[in-house]
């Protein structure tokens, strides 16, 4: 039996094409766990949206590591802004580091394998916070 998987790239391209008839640029809040993971997504989305990167990751082990990754994210964005990838400057929002949020949702799941229930709860936590921030700040889209 052939399993039909979602082609999210094609769905994204179709959405972008459907927006092209609009006479405005849409604002998109992009959650980022780190600069390397967001690099290709930013390249793909920047020509079509006014991007703001949302750096929020309470699952990071220490404040030092959280700050280091946030600084790398800022550095990547500054490079992209210098290269004028978009007609709009890419912005960043760095949420305060609060690992307690992660500890609360992962309590009792310490022995779960990578990619298991603990990870699913962490994804939900971060995307829910991204959605809340997008709504609060009036973004058209979030991802």
Description of each model-found segment:
Residues 4-143:
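ATP-dependent adenylation/nucleotidyltransferase module used to activate substrates
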């Amino acid at each position: 039996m052939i399993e039909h998987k979602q082609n999210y790239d094609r769905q994204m391209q179709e959405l972008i094409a459907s927006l092209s008839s609009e006479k405005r640029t849409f604002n998109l809040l992009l959650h980022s766990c780190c600069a390397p993971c967001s690099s290709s997504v930013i390249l793909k989305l920047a020509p079509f949206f006014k991007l703001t990167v949302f750096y929020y990751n309470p699952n990071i082990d220490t404040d030092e590591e959280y700050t280091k990754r946030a600084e790398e994210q800022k550095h990547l964005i500054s490079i992209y802004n210098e290269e004028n990838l978009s007609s709009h400057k890419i912005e960043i929002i760095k949420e305060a580091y609060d690992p307690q949020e992660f500890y609360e949702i992962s309590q009792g799941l310490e022995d779960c394998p990578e990619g298991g229930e603990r990870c699913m709860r962490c994804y939900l936590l971060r995307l829910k916070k991204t959605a809340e921030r997008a709504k609060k700040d009036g973004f058209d889209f979030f991802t």
